Curated annotation (Swiss-Prot):
SUPFAM superfamilies: Ribosomal protein S5 domain 2-like. Its EC number is 3.1.26.5. RNaseP catalyzes the removal of the 5'-leader sequence from pre-tRNA to produce the mature 5'-terminus. It can also cleave other RNA substrates such as 4.5S RNA. The protein component plays an auxiliary but essential role in vivo by binding to the 5'-leader sequence and broadening the substrate specificity of the ribozyme. It catalyses: Endonucleolytic cleavage of RNA, removing 5'-extranucleotides from tRNA precursor. GO terms for cellular component: ribonuclease P complex. Consists of a catalytic RNA component (M1 or rnpB) and a protein subunit. PANTHER family: RIBONUCLEASE P PROTEIN COMPONENT (PTHR33992:SF1). It comes from the Bacteria. Keywords: Endonuclease, Hydrolase, Nuclease, RNA-binding, tRNA processing. GO terms for biological process: tRNA 5'-leader removal. It comes from Mesoplasma florum (strain ATCC 33453 / NBRC 100688 / NCTC 11704 / L1). This is Ribonuclease P protein component.
Amino acid sequence: MKNKKIIKKNFEFQEIISKQEFHRNSAFVIYYSKNDKGYFRYGISVGKKLGNAVTRNKIKRQIRMMIQDQIKILPEFSYDIVIIARNRMMQNSFDQNQKELNKLVVRFLK
């Protein structure tokens, strides 16, 4: 069975965000913290201000696709990452959003 490595619990989100280690740009905010699990985990947060449930789920699906592309490229590293979508993401195309997320991941890895 495939392990999705997704953060789902609210207390895990709060723990990562409370450490105040983040990078941001116009479309996304990425909070991160080192974990001791030995593998990468991620969580996605989309606020209600970005639209109705259909729109928010579409955004989450797009971010998951962007992350899947990143996982193939990146080596294994043990971090927990929370990706928060911002309003600007709605105005950009999928390709522009993917470039923005790639820039943040590169900045995060440095």
